[in-house]
Design a protein with these regions (language model features):
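N-terminal cap/lid segment of alpha/beta-hydrolase-fold proteins
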Residues: 46, 51-107
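Short beta-strand element of the alpha/beta-hydrolase
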Residues: 109-120
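Short amphipathic alpha-helix adjacent to the substrate-entry channel of hydrolases
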Residues: 127-150
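Alpha/beta-hydrolase active-site loop
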Residues: 156-177
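Primarily recognizes the serine-hydrolase "nucleophile elbow" in alpha/beta-hydrolase
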Residues: 176, 181-229
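Short beta-strand/loop motif that positions the catalytic acidic residue
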Residues: 229, 234-237, 241
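Short alpha-helix in the alpha/beta-hydrolase fold that links the catalytic acid
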Residues: 245-256
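C-terminal catalytic histidine-bearing segment of alpha/beta-hydrolase fold enzymes
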Residues: 262-295
Length: 295
């Protein structure tokens, strides 16, 4: 091969790498009813905005938002046409069969988001258009409109077997969408799986962020591959959570921030909110775009 051709190929390769890097950094989820899902008033903010206390009122944020409180949101908050991009699937893996609902591009996705339910939940919870104020409908639309993939799976338990099933699901879709970052949102007890996945080096290398919604803490995260990779973490928590006390989660958030200078972690406290409030109120687009913007 001539020297000139070698130089041309090297220059072209450099251009492709640079162009790909720009695209990865520039990915931003499309808008989806942003005004309706924006946080109410921020009551206080600290740590450079990493910690916020947000106003939450049941009469406004449940009764004023739902046509049937906690069962059916007002139609303004949802766009059900996204169901055309929704599939109920079963994946055969070495860890077993993983039933899951997929919304969006199952190959060549720009980003991948999973929701892992809590105790008593199932794969259908994460794709229910009408409950939790329409917030699951919003994430479905956000991913479908942005060329991404949203997954809501079943799993056997919140321990090693469940983590293996979810890791296998992530691996399958990540291999079909090279370069797509993977974001795992864990509701309540589902957080046990978030922290287990953080310990798996192969999975951690694929993670673009963890979202803990009314969930638990785990000090072992500070020694995990995900922590070493500075995987962004978001905490959404109700101040009146009786399952996982907010003070313990706030203390864990501060421990993360103090253990690694500038660690990308955010905390939104919903004042007067309860255990399920973060699933209803967390702003998917704001949080995921912040995570996507991290180096």
């Amino acid at each position: 091969m001539s020297l000139a051709r070698s130089c041309i190929r090297l220059a072209f390769a450099g251009f492709v790498v640079a162009f790909s890097g720009v695209n990865a950094q520039a990915l931003e989820l499309a808008s989806q009813k942003d005004r309706l899902f924006a946080y109410p008033a921020v009551l206080s903010s600290s740590d450079g905005g990493a910690y916020r206390v947000v106003d939450y009122r049941e009469m406004r944020d449940i009764n004023g938002r739902d046509a049937v409180p906690e069962r059916r949101v007002d139609g303004r908050y949802i766009s059900t046409g996204v169901r055309r991009a929704q599939q109920d699937l079963a994946l055969q893996t070495k860890a077993g069969t993983v039933r899951h609902v997929a919304v969006g591009k199952t190959e060549g996705a720009s980003a991948i988001v999973l929701y892992l339910h809590g105790q008593g939940g199932n794969r259908r919870q994460g794709v229910d258009d009408f409950t939790f104020g329409g917030n699951f409908n919003r994430i479905k639309n956000l991913m479908a409109k942005s060329g991404g993939l949203y997954l809501s799976p079943d799993f056997s338990d919140f321990e090693a077997r469940g983590a293996q099933e979810i890791a296998a699901l992530i691996a399958y879709y990540a291999e079909r969408s090279p370069g797509a970052r993977v974001f795992v949102a864990c509701g309540s007890m589902g957080g046990a799986l978030c922290w287990r996945l953080a310990q798996d080096r192969v999975t951690a290398d694929r993670l673009g962020g963890l979202l803990l919604l009314g969930s638990m803490w785990n000090d072992a995260f500070l020694q995990s591959p995900a922590f070493a990779e500075r995987v962004p973490v978001f905490f959404g928590h109700g101040s009146e959570d009786r399952v996982f006390p907010v003070g313990s989660q706030e203390a864990f958030f501060r421990k993360i921030r103090s253990s690694a200078k500038g660690y990308p972690a955010r905390f939104v406290r919903f004042e007067s909110g309860t255990h399920g409030t973060p699933i209803r109120m967390s702003d998917w687009r704001e949080t995921l775009n912040w995570m996507l913007a991290q180096p």
